[in-house]
């Protein structure tokens, strides 16, 4: 085992490498993507919107990413926002301008699919009204309008990037969507005329960034470009396989890569799952291993568990291997990146969930019926902690024995090798375990 910075990490030229979140998000995908992007020609987003968020520290600068692919930090990579993404144009340009102010040259390095759906202010208004209607049973969305944007997509009333360049069609769709929302919510005041003027200006500003993403990505594959896909959110937030209805509105699994970029499954060469060494979640929804005690408080404080997008405190608990086994079955990980191992350094003992007892029966796969989890008993394996710093360790041989046992148990339980191990917040504090 050695530091990533010493060994280098290569990305295949024989197909797409995908980085996916394996839990409820915030696993640390951005840092791995940043490292991998040192050797990438194309970095792409395939789903979600600016509800995702992560921070990258490079070249003495801190960069916050929400809608843009983090491959922009590497001056050699070209970046693509795919067809499965929903894009709020003011946020797109705001984020881009912030990167340029910090010295990143983004010229001819960021492109957006002409098939991507657009998010508008009326989607954000609808998002807030939906949450208010749900009251105590609200989902805990980011309020960015992502769900309503995917809703209009599903009902075929959505507006795509290419509609900006067929203005009569754009205007007709825009006016109808606002009228429909006014019928739905009643008091829904909205400056349609002002927004249409704004979007005419944004259309002209956006035009140099718009591409046929299908031709773009398949040309890259044909030319043996090194392509990395940066997953947003995570498996347990997937619309179909997550903790429904406490999920996001897109497909955040490996299937979403194919549908969001327009590539066949055989084009994917390598799938890396990112796993936090414990578990966190933002917003409402089931969380079987949540620790509403000093353990959760310690993880939250030491792990600096605040959302990049919302600033909300993350809920914290022990690692859940039932969730991760389920995640592995669906996404088919070739390897894992275990992050934030150092946050566990001070614990005298560490627990890992290996099964649930539901209605008197032991289950080892995550159930669809979330109500059954409310009374579930969690079966844990308990490990002695290592109670020594892992930050600064550069070789597997120097890793505390109890930390090795923890890592090896996870590998054996899931049947997937842990290739990357994070032992600190810095870009160079990631070890490659061969």
UniProtKB/Swiss-Prot annotation:
Cofactor binding comment, as recorded: Binds 1 Mg(2+) ion per subunit.
Protein residues bound to IMP: 26-29, 51-54, 142, 156, 233, 248, 312
Binding site residues for substrate: 308-314
Residue ranges of the TM segments: none
Alphabetized UniProt keyword annotations: Cytoplasm, GTP-binding, Ligase, Magnesium, Metal-binding, Nucleotide-binding, Purine biosynthesis
UniProt GO BP: 'de novo' AMP biosynthetic process; cellular response to cadmium ion; IMP metabolic process
Co-factor(s): Mg(2+)
Superkingdom in the source lineage: Eukaryota
Pfam families: Adenylsucc_synt
Keyword Protease among record annotations: no
EC id: 6.3.4.4
A GO term from the CC aspect: cytoplasm
Binding residue positions for Mg(2+): 26, 53
Residues that, per the record, bind GTP: 25-31, 53-55, 314, 340-342, 422-424
Catalytic activity: IMP + L-aspartate + GTP = N(6)-(1,2-dicarboxyethyl)-AMP + GDP + phosphate + 2 H(+)
Cytoplasm keyword on record: yes
CDD domains, per database record: AdSS
Functional note: Plays an important role in the de novo pathway and in the salvage pathway of purine nucleotide biosynthesis. Catalyzes the first committed step in the biosynthesis of AMP from IMP.
Subunit-structure text: Homodimer.
Family membership: Belongs to the adenylosuccinate synthetase family.
Protein name as it appears in the record: Adenylosuccinate synthetase
Source species of the chain: Schizosaccharomyces japonicus (strain yFS275 / FY16936)
